[in-house]
C-alpha cells in the first residue's frame, strides 16, 4: 500500500463489538482515501461522539442510507442516514499484542 501519512489514521479499538475481527486493544490503520461503502465491509466512522469501527453496507432500497452492524452478533444492527455519520476510511492493517 502506498499512502501519504496524511491519508492514514491510527486508532485504538475499545470494546468487543467487532470481535473476533478486532479485539479490545488492537490498533487499526485506516486508509482515509477509501470512504465509499460500494463494497461492504469494515469502516471507521465518526458518529459525532468519536470513532467507531463497524461493518457498513449501503441499503439499495433507501438511497443515502447505510446498514451498520458489528462482527459480534450480541450487538444489534441499525440503519443510519449518510448525513448523520462521516465515513473516515477503511481498515487496511492492524496490530495486536501477543
Language-model features: where?
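Acidic/glycine-rich C-terminal interaction modules and beta/coil loop segments
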Residues: 3-98
Amino acid at each position: 500500500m502506498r499512502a501519504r501519512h496524511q491519508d492514514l489514521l491510527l486508532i485504538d479499538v475499545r470494546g468487543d463489538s467487532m470481535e473476533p475481527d478486532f479485539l479490545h486493544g488492537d490498533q487499526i490503520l485506516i486508509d482515509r482515501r477509501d470512504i465509499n461503502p460500494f463494497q461492504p465491509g469494515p469502516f471507521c466512522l465518526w458518529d459525532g461522539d468519536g470513532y467507531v469501527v463497524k461493518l457498513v453496507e449501503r441499503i439499495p432500497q433507501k438511497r443515502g442510507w447505510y446498514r451498520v452492524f458489528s462482527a459480534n452478533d450480541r450487538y444489534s444492527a441499525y440503519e443510519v442516514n449518510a448525513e448523520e455519520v462521516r465515513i473516515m476510511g477503511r481498515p487496511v492493517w492492524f496490530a495486536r499484542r501477543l
